[in-house]
């Protein structure tokens, strides 16, 4: 049995779909930080079957929760102070995403004018589809 201790102060990213923890770990560039980080994979979960957890021993880290909600909307963020949960955030799919998804349409203005931000709006929550603000190109976050 593997035992991971609690953290005194920091952030716990919980209820990550199994296998998605490494994506979040890499997105947050946690391999190059000065503080302790634990990526725990394939943990038993009564709710998900298996899940991943990331524990970050630094509550000052700047995290874009919108992007985490795009990667996995089932995530729970726990802000820890003195080994107790101070705040709990449940993520969801963001309604608007800016400069995270890139438009693939070669005729889109964002392909020609590099300074224009890539803006997408959620159009279908079940299919996890977003639409480009400028050219209406559909982007599926989860490919079938």
Swiss-Prot record:
Descriptive protein name: Aspartate carbamoyltransferase regulatory chain
Entry's cofactor comment: Binds 1 zinc ion per subunit.
Native species: Clostridium tetani (strain Massachusetts / E88)
Record-level Gene Ontology MF annotations: metal ion binding
GO terms for biological process, alphabetical: 'de novo' pyrimidine nucleobase biosynthetic process; pyrimidine nucleotide biosynthetic process
Known function: Involved in allosteric regulation of aspartate carbamoyltransferase.
Alphabetical UniProt keywords: Metal-binding, Pyrimidine biosynthesis, Zinc
Subunit-level organization: Contains catalytic and regulatory chains.
Cofactor: Zn(2+)
Family statement drawn from the similarity comment of this UniProt entry: Belongs to the PyrI family.
Gene: pyrI
Entries under InterPro entries matching the protein: Asp_carbamoyltransf_reg_N, Asp_carbamoylTrfase_reg, Asp_carbamoyltrfase_reg_C, Asp_carbatrfase_reg_C_sf, Asp_carbatrfase_reg_N_sf
Signal peptide residue numbers: none
Disulfide bonds: none
């Amino acid at each position: 049995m593997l035992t991971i201790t609690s953290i005194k102060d920091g952030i716990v990213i919980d209820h990550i779909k199994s296998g998605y923890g490494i994506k979040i770990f890499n997105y947050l560039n946690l391999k190059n930080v000065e503080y302790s980080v634990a990526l725990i994979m394939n943990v038993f979960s009564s709710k998900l079957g298996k899940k991943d957890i990331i524990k970050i021993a630094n509550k000052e880290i700047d995290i874009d929760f919108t992007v985490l909600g795009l990667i996995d909307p089932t995530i729970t963020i726990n802000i820890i102070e003195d080994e107790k949960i101070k705040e709990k955030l449940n993520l969801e799919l963001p309604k608007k995403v800016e400069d995270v998804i890139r438009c693939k349409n070669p005729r889109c203005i964002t392909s020609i004018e590099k300074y224009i931000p890539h803006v997408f709006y959620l159009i279908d929550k079940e299919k996890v589809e977003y639409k480009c603000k400028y050219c209406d190109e559909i982007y599926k976050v989860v490919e079938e």
